[in-house]
Amino acid sequence: MTHPEQLGKLFVPDGIVKRVGGMTEALLVFVTRLRSSDEVDENYTRITEFVIVGFPSLQPEYFQLVAWFFFLFYVTTVVGNLLLVMVFAWEHSLQKPMYIIMVSLALSDIGFTTVAVPKLIARYWWNDGSLGFHTCLLQEHMIHYFGSLNSLILLSMALDRYLAICFPFRYPILMTNQTMTGLTLSCWVVAHIFPGIATIGFATMPFCGPNQIIHAFCETMSLTPLVCGDTSKQLGAAYAGAMFILYVPLAFIIISYICIIISILRMANGQGRIKTFSTCATQGCIISIYYIPRFFVYSTPFFPNLKMTPDIRIATTLFYSLLPSLINPFIYCLRTNEIKMILRRWVQRKKCITPIK
């Protein structure tokens, strides 16, 4: 029988984060070496590695339970999103603009989960929360990159639904597969801008202790307290970038859905109205889960009376970061008739092949 730790290492290699993005990490090393030696007081020792603490109040007897929870969460998320990608790749009938967005979102969810979760599992399974300095900065960049990417993908999804519902006759001309592919590729590139600026800023700043990160992974708000010296400019720039990449798309999403709701209410066909509204409600649920908790967390620094304990803050961050990645493929598979029909046909085909064998 396979021991739990062996099973964990089979699916979640301890150094998975350290193997991601060698070129990016090399760039971070180069940028870090540009720091002048007078930035750090000689009395300080420069940090070479960080330690992920996770939930600071969690008792050791619950470590294995938490590790198992995140391990099962990770496997389920990756398998569910990979299934969605495979269905799209094998079924030519699904190669439409709407499904191109779904696949892009699925790949983004796989990327974010793979960057964020394995080290958290290692922290509680093998009590190994250490990350090299540049590996931590790389993780910080990728965490915010995939968060920004998801925001842009949700904007693209809202734009697609807006054109499909408000301009149904012009939609096939306005939104072709080539147009949507170019739009999604642009999202994957543009999403690097603000996280890249923040990461380069951190790479040029002095970290001189302590090195414990009170969070589930390396990210801007958890790294800032570890910087020596004044961080107001960097923190202000990071907040400005986060607000822009999150809430500018959200504003356009809200406007597009207001237009969609108006168009739905004008529909003469009651059955078509219900079907269209159901599709939009599904996407609205995903958007709400993604944005509302983020707004709550990012707003706390501006309200001194609104305080969150580290455990609640970490739990809230994990909720809005990881839950959409888990439920997205299941919601779209269960609520999209074309995907349900294809999965049903696969199952029936499997049942027919098995007796023949």
What do these predicted ranges mean?
Residues 1-357:
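Transmembrane helical core of 7TM receptor-like proteins
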